[in-house]
Regions:
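Gly/Ser-rich "nucleophile elbow"/oxyanion-hole loop immediately N-terminal to the catalytic nucleophile
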Residues: 161-206, 218, 223
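Short beta-strand element of the alpha/beta-hydrolase
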Residues: 89-92, 101-110
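N-terminal cap/lid segment of alpha/beta-hydrolase-fold proteins
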Residues: 51-98, 166, 171-172
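Mobile cap/lid helix-loop segments that gate and shape the active-site cleft of serine hydrolases
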Residues: 190, 237-283, 288-290, 294-303, ...
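Hydrolase active-site cap/lid region
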Residues: 214-264, 321-325, 330-337
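Serine-hydrolase catalytic core
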Residues: 270-326, 367, 373-381, 392
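Cap/lid segment of the alpha/beta-hydrolase catalytic domain
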Residues: 130-179, 233-253
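Surface beta-strand/loop "capping" patches
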Residues: 345-387, 404-413
């Protein structure tokens, strides 16, 4: 519940023979509609995921012992998409000291992997206390004349709008590859005589975070939790005008979409159909599994408070972790460790370990001060109030600072904290709280939403 005593930035006749002929024509058209022959080939998310993939296969290409565990290398062929066979590197990191061996965190990413990422993968496995896997080459690229990343996604959206072929949107094969990676991991562990992997936490960043949402929407019972990172654009039809109100024009980071006229095209009937297929917000009633949203402040792709356009509509257990001054890349070793620790706590909780805290928060505004009260069912080890200010709604270049929060009740200091920040007479102030917890000697952080406010006029 949020007390809104302040101005919040708005997050928009003929003869018998002719009659018989007309009746026959109507009947024929009705049959065509029922048969689906009146429209282009359809491939909604469910049918795309169900489509058989005869090329699917995997093989083990390597195994080596490293400090802290074992790394297994697999080569995965996931599917055929638009005539091309998708291939991936799939690395599995098994820690020597595992809390659970029947659960796996699966991180999907781009690139082809490097030896330098072995340390990161094994560190993640040790922190989570269970196998950790990295699926590479999401998506397979470059394609169509060298297109990669956002230019490739924008191209596939245009192809959908031109053809009506619902298998074109790139996130579909990206998400299906994740499902096929789960198949491969389970098949490998069975063949190797290892403990069967029964549950997965799926994670990924940016467009791979979008992939994470859609994989979760598959209703695959193996997916027990999801961690979408730095993909703060659910409810796209509301996000577009919200960003324009904040920035005055689309972010420079979405130039590939702007150049293709996507902001306008997405408001057309074909564009709305695309979003019904692609926008994870369309699948929110399915996304009831536990979810941890990892975001960076100053992420230039999205409006700073974009989460507030969909957070309340997310079903099931949910948590958020903002990372101050971290941007879209979640830069900095401290940030990366904070993210790994939070993902570890989340994965352990989803796998049946200690449940995560359930913080609740309430914002208020009084006497030119913004207030934030936070309550927690589990003791809080420490709490910070993060704040930033800008003359406009554009906080992309704002510098975030923090101050300690104080107990609401000194007699019960670890279950409730508050913080306040003066709001200047001009401009906009954003605040959120970071809460640090400790479970079984492992520290991790969670945060509240960001609230962006201006003095009440």
């Amino acid at each position: 519940v949020i007390s809104r005593n302040f101005t919040v930035v708005p997050l928009r006749k003929q003869d018998k023979e002719d009659s018989r002929m007309r009746t026959l024509l109507i009947g024929l058209l009705t049959c065509l509609v029922l048969l689906g022959l009146d429209r282009p080939a359809r491939a909604d998310l469910d049918s795309y995921f169900r489509k058989p993939e005869p090329v699917y296969k995997w093989e083990k290409t390597g195994e080596k012992k490293v400090d802290g565990g074992t790394v297994i290398d697999l080569h995965l062929v996931s599917q055929t998409w638009q005539g091309g066979v998708w291939q991936h590197r799939l690395m599995i990191f098994r820690p020597d000291k595992a809390v659970r061996t029947d659960f796996c965190t699966l991180f999907n990413t781009g690139g082809g992997g490097s030896d330098g990422e072995i340390t990161l993968g094994m560190t993640a496995a040790q922190i989570t206390g269970m196998p950790f896997a990295i699926l590479y080459n999401i998506p397979n690229q470059p394609l169509y004349g060298g297109k990669t990343e956002d230019s490739l996604i924008a191209y596939t959206w245009e192809k959908f709008m031109e053809t009506g072929d619902e298998s074109w949107p790139l996130h579909f094969p990206m998400a299906k590859a994740v499902l096929k990676a789960m198949d491969a991991i389970q098949a490998y562990t069975k063949e190797a005589g290892q403990t069967e992997i029964k549950g997965f936490v799926i994670a990924g960043a940016s467009k791979r975070g979008w992939t994470t949402w859609l994989a979760g929407a598959s209703k695959d019972p193996r997916i027990k939790g999801i961690v979408p990172m730095v993909i703060d654009t659910l409810n796209v039809t509301a996000q577009i005008p919200h960003q324009l109100a904040a920035y005055g024009k689309p972010s420079e980071k979405v130039q590939d979409y702007t150049s293709a006229g996507m902001q306008e095209k997405l408001m057309t009937p074909q564009g709305k159909r695309l979003l019904a297929l692609e926008d994870p917000y369309s699948y929110r009633d399915r996304l009831t599994m536990p979810k941890l949203l990892v975001l960076g402040t100053n992420d230039r792709y999205w409006s700073q408070d974009a989460l507030n356009l969909y957070w309340d509509d997310l079903k099931g257990p949910k948590w958020v972790l903002y990372n101050s001054n971290a941007g879209h890349g979640l830069e900095g070793l401290d940030t990366q460790l904070r993210v790994l620790n939070a993902v570890g706590a989340f994965a352990r909780a989803v796998a049946g370990g200690n449940p995560l805290p359930k913080p609740t928060w309430k914002y208020g505004f009084r006497d030119n001060f913004s207030y934030l009260d936070v309550h927690s069912d589990i003791p809080i080890k420490s709490a910070k109030l993060w704040f930033a200010h800008s003359d406009t709604q554009d906080l992309r270049d704002a510098k975030w600072a923090s101050a300690p929060m104080s107990p609401i009740d000194p007699a019960n200091p670890t279950h409730g904290v508050f913080g306040s920040k003066g709001v200047p007479a001009q401009g906009y102030t954003a605040i959120y709280a970071e809460l640090t917890y400790a479970q079984n000697g492992k520290a991790f952080s969670l945060t509240t939403q960001i609230e962006l406010m201006a003095p009440k006029k």
